[in-house]
């Protein structure tokens, strides 16, 4: 019934099983086993990172639909769903990496034709999966690198979308979690302002190059030791 998504039959089963503790626990057990089985297949299969996230979101929406439509938004069922997903996504760091990759691909796209409501909906779906990660610092480490690359490349960056995601992460994990991201944002804005001031100054007149610099706060940006050593070897 769960696999077939038969809401009527699931509602009947829920109404019968919820009356007895042992039966209700059996229902929760079967639901958890279904989520773990389906989710584990996604994590273990050789699927692309963005496909993994899309399918994980679909799985969550599917079981959440069962909980809300067939099981009267039962809080115990909600806890069962949460614990099952936590078991799936915390086996290793694959899901954390996949979320960062998915967000990177999404945020690189042009958001001019997407309204605020649609942007919020898409980000919220990702945040739902993010909540299941127990070690969110792993996600933060991957995300900082991805975020820094997007800022430095400045290719098709949608500032509104980037800001919206940082705010959502801040709501979920607090100010300390997003401190580096906010500092990096400020660094880029300050760098852009300084470059514009220089280009408008008499000093820049007659230059045959497009002069641009990035001023970054020490200790806040990712530090690639290999890259640093490479540049130190240049005479």
Give the positions of each predicted feature.
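Eukaryotic scaffold/interaction segments
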Residues: 1-235
């Amino acid at each position: 019934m769960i696999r077939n998504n038969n809401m009527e039959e699931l509602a009947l089963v829920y109404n019968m099983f919820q009356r007895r503790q042992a039966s209700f626990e059996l229902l929760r057990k079967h639901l958890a086993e279904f989520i773990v089985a389906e989710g584990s297949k996604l994590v273990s299969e050789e699927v692309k990172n963005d496909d993994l996230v899309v399918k994980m979101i679909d799985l969550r929406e599917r079981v959440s639909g069962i909980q809300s439509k067939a099981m009267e938004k039962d809080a115990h069922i909600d806890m069962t769903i949460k614990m099952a997903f936590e078991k799936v996504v915390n086996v290793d760091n694959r899901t954390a990496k996949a979320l960062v990759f998915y967000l990177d691909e999404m945020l690189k796209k042009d958001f001019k034709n997407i309204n605020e409501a649609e942007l919020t909906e898409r980000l919220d779906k990702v945040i739902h999966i993010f909540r299941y990660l127990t070690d969110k610092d792993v996600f933060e480490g991957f995300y900082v690198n991805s975020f820094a690359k997007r800022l430095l490349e400045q290719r098709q960056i949608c500032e509104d979308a980037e800001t919206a995601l940082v705010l959502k992460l801040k709501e979920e994990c607090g100010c300390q979690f997003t401190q580096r991201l906010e500092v990096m944002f400020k660094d880029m804005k300050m760098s852009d302002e300084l470059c514009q001031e220089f280009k408008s100054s008499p000093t820049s007149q007659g230059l045959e190059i497009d002069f641009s610099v990035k001023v970054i706060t020490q200790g806040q940006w990712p530090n690639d030791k290999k890259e640093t050593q490479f540049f130190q070897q240049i005479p």
